Amino acid sequence: KCGHLNDMRLVTTEEMCAKVAAAKRARRDLRIIARTDAVQSEGLDGAIVRMNRYIEAGADIAFADALVDEHMFRTFTSRISVPFIANMAEFGRTPYYTATQFEAMGCKLVIWPASSLRIAARAMEKLYATIAKEGETRPLLDNMLTRAELYEVINYFDFESLDASVARSVVPPTADEPTWPDNT
């Protein structure tokens, strides 16, 4: 359950260590991020003890969710031996910090996991409210990517080239099916 919510139930440290060790054995070219939400239930020190066990089991990056102040970040990052990833979740327990502020607290990576979703959801609300009220989307055209811009963003022409390079299967008609001239 998300570290920003209540009523979390954690797996035991031993179970999580076993999961990290299994991921380490199975990996080829990836980094293992170990996450803990134990700060709320076990306190900062307990969460750090857990994380250090996960690191011993093979975690490459530490992630403790829902830290609530600069002291917590600085303490956590100073007591582990791997890079720390911060989670900037708007409207959560963690105060708003910039990437520079996170870096100053010892964080090597920062994620904004729901930011684009929140922005997109607000834009969709605006779109459908406009359609409901105006019956059209023209008032929002300046907020939209043009077709050319969209194709650039999604690399459309790369996919078109890939598609053209793939052989197309043709199912031959059976004896009882009519054969149609290919005039499509």
Regions found by a protein language model. Give the residues of each.
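Flexible, glycine/charged-enriched surface loops at secondary-structure junctions
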Residues: 134-142
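Contiguous mixed-secondary-structure segments that line small-molecule binding/active-site clefts
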Residues: 147
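Alpha/beta enzyme core
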Residues: 1-112, 118-129, 156, 162-182
